[in-house]
Amino acid sequence: YLHILAGLLKPKTGEIEIDKTDIVSLSEKATDKFRGKHIGVVFQKSHFIGALTVLENLEMASWLATGKKHTKRAKKLLEQLGIENQASKLPSQLSIGQQQRVSIARALMNEPKVLLADEPTSSLDDKNAEKVIELLTSLSKEYKAALLIVTHDNRIKEKFINKITLV
C-alpha cells in the first residue's frame, strides 16, 4: 500500500489526492516530479547512488525535485540525525543504521507534504530509534506534513495516538 500512496504503483481503481492533486491521474513523468516535491519516502531497505557521497545523495534528491542542491539543509538534517561526520563517505561505507538515517534525511530534503516511512527504525538501536521518531514527528509538524509509519517496532508503536492496525 505504501508504494501506491507514494505514486510508485497505480491502484486499479480510486483516487489518491495529495495537496489537492489526484496523483493517479498524472502521467508517469508528472507523478515522479510531484513525488519529488511533495512526498518523502523512507523505504525499509535503503537505496542510494553508490558512486556519490552521503551529502551528494541528499543534494541529488533536492536537485532532481527543485533544481537546487540545498547543501545547508542537507548538512542540518545529517546533524539532526547524528551522522554529520559521515557526509563525505560513500553509502557503502556506512553501517545499516547509518544508511537508514541517511534515507530519512533524503526523504525530508524537500519538505514534503506527506512523509511515508516503512520500518524507519528497524535497523536502529534504542537511542537512535528515539532520535529518528522525534525528528520525523517534529519535522512533520513543522512542515505540516502527514506522517504515515508502517512498523512492527514495539518501541515506537505507543508513541502515536492515531493508529491503524492490520492483522
Predicted regions and their residues:
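Conserved ABC transporter NBD signature motif
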Residues: 14-22
